[in-house]
């Protein structure tokens, strides 16, 4: 009886130890779907699924002079390129130029959006809006 109890306890102990030590190796996947705010302008952008790809459009602006930008699709058809990362064309709604865009989730409440031309990139971390 004691041997069975000890054996059972040992098995549980080993199982618990293995599961706890495996935790640091687990990667958390976050997705960008929802509304995010660009801190530099107060613009809110909704990221949504479009035929299995990532799209984004402007849904609100802080500056009334930018009101005409509401509804502008700034990203269409971005594909998942790595865990927590999507790549696709990114429209700068202010100047009409298209850049290579990279969306990277930095956690459940932080999205980094980066636009690149050749090897020059600029990015900004956005918060949930």
Say what each PLM segment does:
Residues 2-15:
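Bacterial N-terminal signal peptides that target proteins for export
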Residues 128-129:
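Short, solvent-exposed mixed-charge patches
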Residues 100-124:
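Short, exposed beta-strand-loop hairpins at the edges of beta-sheets
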Residues 23-29:
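Sec/Tat signal peptide C-region and signal peptidase I cleavage site
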Residues 15-17, 27:
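Cleavable N-terminal signal peptides
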Residues 32-100:
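Central antiparallel beta-sheet cores of small beta-barrel/beta-sandwich binding domains
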